[in-house]
Design a protein with these regions (language model features):
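N-terminal pre-domain/capping segments
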Residues: 1-89
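Structural detector of well-ordered beta-strand residues that form the stable sheet scaffold
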Residues: 7, 63, 92, 128, ...
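Active-site beta-loop-alpha junctions enriched in small/polar residues
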Residues: 9-13, 41-43, 66-70, 96-98, ...
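Loop/helix-junction capping segments adjacent to catalytic residues or to phosphate/diphosphate-binding pockets
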Residues: 17, 45, 73, 100-103, ...
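Charged helix-capping and loop-helix junction motifs
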Residues: 21-25, 76-77, 105-114, 141-146, ...
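Alpha-helix-loop-beta-strand connector modules within alpha/beta enzyme cores
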Residues: 49-67, 113-120, 146-154
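Glycine/small-residue-rich loop that forms an oxyanion/phosphate-binding "nest" at active or ligand-binding sites
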Residues: 74-113
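Acidic/histidine-rich catalytic cores of soluble enzymes
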Residues: 118-179
Length: 179
C-alpha cells in the first residue's frame, strides 16, 4: 500500500458484511467508490482464502486487520497463517479487552501484548493498537493510552491513532500523532 493511500475501514459497514454474498457485494461497492485498500474487521464468517480471492478479483489490498485479542493469545499461529493468506503484515486489535480497563490492567496489557507483538515481529508482522476515547481516562498523572504506549515495547507495539476517538476524548489528535 502506498504511504498516503486511504483505505476503507470495513467495520463502518459491518451491517452489510454478514454473509459471503454480502461481503462480495460490499467489497465491489467499496472498489467502485474508488478505494484500493481495505481494513478487515467486523465481518461475518468467511474463510481467509475466499476473502483474499474476493479482494484480489477486485484489485483491493488488505492493508490491515482488527481481530480479537483473545485470538492472538490463544491461536497466534492461526492468526499468522491467516495473515499470510491475506498478504497483510499489519495485525491490529480493535479495542482493549474489558478486564484491562484500569491502571494496573493497562500496564499488564502493555507487557503481555508486547510479548505477542514481539512474536509477530519475529515472523515479519506488525502489531497495531487501535484506540478509543476511554483510553484517555486518567489514572494519576497518566492516561490509559499513555500507560499503554509508555509501558509497552516501542519497537514492536505500534499505534493506529483514531483521530475521531482522540478528539471525542477531549485530546488533540495532532499532538497524539506527533507523539
Amino acid at each position: 500500500m502506498e504511504r498516503n493511500q486511504i483505505a476503507a475501514q470495513l467495520y463502518t459497514i459491518r451491517e452489510y458484511l454478514k454473509t459471503p454474498s454480502d461481503i462480495a457485494a460490499s467489497l465491489k461497492r467499496v472498489r467502485d467508490i474508488g478505494y484500493q485498500a481495505v481494513q478487515i474487521s467486523g465481518m461475518g464468517p468467511i474463510g481467509p482464502a475466499e476473502l483474499k480471492k474476493m479482494t484480489d478479483d477486485l484489485g483491493l489490498e488488505i492493508c490491515n486487520t482488527h481481530i480479537d485479542y483473545k485470538r492472538m493469545e490463544e491461536d497466534l499461529a492461526g492468526v499468522i497463517e491467516e495473515h499470510e493468506i491475506y498478504g497483510c503484515r499489519y495485525i491490529g486489535i480493535g479495542g482493549l479487552p474489558g478486564e484491562y480497563r484500569n491502571a494496573d490492567g493497562y500496564h499488564r496489557f502493555a507487557v503481555a501484548a508486547s510479548k505477542i507483538a514481539a512474536a509477530l515481529a519475529a515472523e515479519g508482522f506488525i502489531f497495531i493498537y487501535h484506540n478509543h476515547s476511554f483510553e484517555l481516562e486518567r489514572y494519576g498523572d497518566r492516561t490509559g493510552l499513555q500507560i499503554l504506549y509508555e509501558d509497552s515495547d516501542p519497537t514492536v507495539f505500534m499505534a493506529e491513532i483514531d483521530v475521531h476517538w482522540i478528539q471525542r476524548g477531549g485530546a488533540d489528535p495532532a499532538a497524539w500523532i506527533r507523539s
